[in-house]
Structures are given as C-alpha cells and as structure tokens.
Amino acid sequence: MEIKTVTVIGANGTMGCNISGIFASFGNAKVHMACRSMEKAEKAVARAAKSVRAEAIAENLVPATFDDLPACVAESDLIFESVSEDFETKEDIIHRIADHVREDAILATGTSGLSIDKLAEMYPEKLRSRFIGMHFFNPPYTLTLCEIIPSEYTDKEMAKFLMQYAKDKLVRTVVKVADTAAFLGNRIGFQFINEACQYAEMYKDNGGIDYIDAILGQFTGRNMPPIATADFVGLDVHKAIVDNIYNNTKDYARSTFILPDYIQKLIDQGKLGRKVKEGLYKTVVNEAGKKIQYVYDIDSGEYREKMRYSFPFAKKMIDSLHQGDYKAAFDSLKHNHSIEAEICLSFLIKYVLYSITAVKLASDDLHAADAAMATGFGWVPPLAVIDALGGKNEFMKLAQDRLSSELLARIKLKETLKDLPAGSYYDFRSYFKGKQ
C-alpha cells in the first residue's frame, strides 16, 4: 500500500493544520484540508505550509469544507480525524464519512486520550479493523513523537504498515502504546505538570506559580518550566487531559491529577493561557514599550510582576552545568537540604517512578517512556535521570531517603525498579541546561 492522498478533518485546528503540513511535506501526499468553512480552510493551508517552513508544499494542500468530505474521503488512502476532543463531535464526523471510506483505507484519529476502542466501535463493523490512534505532539516539526495506538479490532498488518510509514516517510519517533488513559507521553508529562500546579497552591505564600517554576526550570531537564507549559498548551486542554486521567485510572498517583481550584477559576474567566494572552502568566507592555511578564497570584486572584528568584542550589547547579561538571551539579542538588532543593529533587525522583509505572501499563518496552518524553515533550528521559543521579542503586537510596514512607509504600519501590534496563539510550547531558 502507498499513501498518496490524505484527508485531514478539522484541519484549521492547531494539530490538524500542523499535521497537514507534515503529511504534505515529509509524506509528499496530496492533502485535503477539511474545515467547517472554506475561509477557515484557505487560512489553514497558508498556516500549514508555514509550519513546516516549506511554502512550496502549498500545491499539495487542497482547501475543503465538510460538505466536500464524501468526495475527499473516497479518494483518500488515509483519513486523519482531528476535531474537538469529545465523543459526540467525533461520532458526528464518523457518521458523515463512514459510507464513503474505501475498505483498504486507513482511518486514524489524532485524539490525545479518548478511548481508541470506544471510538472504533462507532464505526461500522467492516471498518473497525482499519481504525487506529495516531497521536502527534505539537509542534510536530520539532517534536517528532508519534504514538500509535491500535484498538482491539485493529488489523495487525495495517498497524505495522502505519508504524513503518510514520517512521520512514514522516520521519517520526514511533512508539506503540496500549489504549490506556492519555496513552503514555501525556500521562507522564501531565502528572508532573499538574502536581507542580498543586505545589504552587501549597506554596502560594512563598510565591506560588513562578516560585515552583523557578525551582523546576531548564536546569532540571526541560525546555520550559512545568506550569508555564500548562499555560502554553492551554488551561482548557490541560483540564481535559488531567480530568480524563483522574476519571480513568486508579494508580498510586491518581490524586496528583486533581485540577487545582485556581486553574478552574481562570478557565471560568476565559483566561486560558498563552493562546488568549492571559492565564497563569501574561505579558504587559509598559508606557516605555518594554515587555514585562506578570504571573497570577493565587492568594489575591490578581496579577503581579514575575519574581526573579535566587536559590543557592540552583545557582551552584547552573554554574556547574556551564562548566560541564555534571557530577558537581547533581551533588549540589543532592547535598542541599533547603526546601527548594528538596522539592526539586523529589520531583525528579517522582518523575522517574511514575514514568516507569505508566510505561509498564502502556508498553512492553521500558525505553518507550524515554522516547516519549525526549521526543514528545523535549524533557530529559526518565531513565536518563537515573543515570544523572548516579545509577540505579544511588537512585533507590535517594528515593528511600527523600520520599515519605506512605508514598513509598504505595509506589512499591523495589518492585517498580525491578528489571530496569542498564541505562538510557539518551545522554542526559544534552537535556540539563545551564539556565533557570
């Protein structure tokens, strides 16, 4: 089989638009970009070409409306649905297209967490074997992860073909995962992010949001601090993901997916984050034309200027990272017992342990969590954190020393760390940046 023609449904959304660009450029496919209006579709074509920095691919991009779906779908080798994250909207699309899909076509959904089995069952029985989850990460031009999620009905040979196509043609880092809540990357990433949001509320008297983000900055192995990441993806999207995980899981970390009240308050006020220029953070231009970053103060419910925090452990880590002395950097973290250093180290330890828990539920390959976090979030992979902290034995000692006995009992530490790979395929040194 060859994928020459693709229909992307919901192509005006951020993911639908960006993925259209990937199919057209890397996949060299003709792409029908179907939107609810032609005006939206034409704007989406221009954005898609720009997203992959190749305006020449515009000739591969065809604007279309939902009224055109029967003809577009009948021509397509792959139909990629990227509409709103709710079953009702997706079922409406399925009813629109089901009678027009070729029996050899691939039906993919870009859902970030809805049940693939449940979506498959919305299709006529004869099409269920052709349906599969294909979860990309934004922006896909730089974040190469593609989670492939078969349903219980998915044809195995078709799944193998799609994985190879995504790897070879679309140049993706492909991870096959089970149909579990939020799959793999988002389950790990949003556990970390939402617990950081919870800690901001716990430590609101110390500064709250920007205080926790300063503790978990770039020097801890991620391009963007965690709470700022929630602001970047959108607080409504963040809520949808963590609510889904909370409602559909029963593991030891379930309570860390409870959305903090202050985030719900911001959502209710329409302050959804960067996409509306106001959320957990906002940028204000003063009278002199200078941009000043403000942060939401949880206690007062107002915005204040973002603080410049100075933590001795962070300064030592950053100085050592600049010098390339990684052992000294992590020694300064492990040997500092300030509240900020304790929070930082505990988050790194819990990140590793939850990653291992999640990957065992979603994959047969423990390295899959490393691939998911490195190429889906740009975060230091969890197994690489173990390497950075001194190896498995040192990591186990740190976990026993720094986590509460109650949490350790729920985690079942020795069982969780049993049969770990010898190390990560990724070099941790490329992820820990000398920046706060």
Regions found by a protein language model. Give the residues of each.
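N-terminal glycine-rich phosphate-binding loop for ADP-containing cofactors
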Residues: 1-436
